[in-house]
Amino acid sequence: MEISALQIARAAYQPKLPKALQGPVKAVEGEATQSVGNQEEIKALFPNTYGMPVITFEAGEKKELPAFNVGVILSGGQAPGGHNVISGLFDGVKALNPKNKLYGFILGPGGLVDHNYMEITSEIMDQYRNTGGFDIIGSGRTKLEKEEQFEKGIEILRELGIKALVIIGGDDSNTNACVLAEYYAAKKYGVQVIGCPKTIDGDLKNEQIETSFGFDTACKTYAELIGNIQRDCNSARKYWHFIKLMGRSASHIALECALQTQPNVCLISEEIEAKEMSLDDVVTYIAKVVADRAADGNHFGTVLIPEGLIEFIPAIKKLIAELNEVLTDPATGESREFANAEEQIDFVKSSIAKDNLAVLESLPEDVARQLCLDRDPHGNVQVSLIETEKLLSRMVAKKLEAWKEEGKFEGSFSAQHHFFGYEGRCAAPSNYDADYCYSLGFNASCLIANGKTGYMSVIKNTTAPAAEWIAGGVPITMMMNIERRNGANKPVIRKALVELDGAPFKFFAAHREEWAKNSCYVYPGPVQYWGPTEVCDQPTKTLKLEQGK
């Protein structure tokens, strides 16, 4: 395999560890924990793994441990740093006993169920250190939810002599890890399950998890591209760039990219929902910024749009909820079948409430058809297929035309469209993510060595130098509550949304009027791996603002 000069040089980078993990450790137990919501229900569902204490690791004395094997799974969408979680786990497991083995299950949780695996040797591991992607073993979206899956899993775990399984994933994957840990504990199978927090969307965080890995690198990658567009925008001075960014459930990426690049407009889904703004309100807000800048002779600008914006507009959210109900067959839980598209649209229009029908008919015809017709296998609207950036620019253009006829707008408006998603998922990890991910993996090996199960590996205090980071573990049940998913109440890890009273949003809100009126663009440039600390090792602005740095 031919590799680039950068990858060769980057392979030599030795990720930094918290001081506590640089030698033998001892586990210090805190108070018993409770779930963030629905305590009685969660306790009843997880009697063997509920109420466990938070763990903090400190320097300890070396212990001789018998050899054991560990399995690892990459679950869900890719995020920069996944390979470093595995390399940290590999090095940690080998440090405990050189005879220990690490097995990777191929293409996600499905590899566990289908008994598809490989041993990760030092020769294989060394090819992937400090690289982006999940290609060492691949990833998948199989959900571990059924007892037959758990039983198929234990067959191969026993065959390979695996004592512990590490699941690297987001909120849904770690919810499944918690369910699996509880099942194996209840059955007394003797297999530990540990989670590691991953998602570039940044929505797996709470008082215990400062950030999910990959968020830092992905945001810096998108911010470079936005900065490049803004430099072009300020050079040609004739286009408005509508840029959609990943983040269906939360607007963390859009907010962080705004803090890094200072665009003219950044929409925050959570604010739009809180203010109960309509789609027309959003369009009017953007159009006013365009008109005000045009009055100053600036016929250009940038608009950042979170991927999930549409689902946060209350009227459309209500419409989508009813569409999901009427287009799902209650008998099967699957999508209803129709002879043709027109029959389906007629059924929708005759089935939904009048206020929802009015919202549907207010949308551009192609978007309304898309909402009615594009479904997933469960009958749910495929919101991610809606090109929100194009929808908004078309509606802004229409409003500006109306204003021009009324004499309220003089100027030109020409739009360009972008969607940044896959560009950031497999980028080579920043120094922050390389260190953070390696520490998460190494820390997971310490949780295994201390006999823990149903825990998530956590590293805190990450705005400080790596030596001062705090390593430990948190019971996954602590992060859970009951939510309605696909028509049923289920225990899930609560997603973290942008907090409108939090420091990152408040900083943005205090500056956005100035950024809207003036061209205050910042050009972050590409992720840097070598050079001064202020260039190479800085965490996200979100994290620094949250910690008052």
Annotate each language-model stretch with its function.
Residues A79-L89, L112-V113, E145-F150, D171-V179, ...:
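Short glycine/serine/threonine-rich phosphate/pyrophosphate-binding segments
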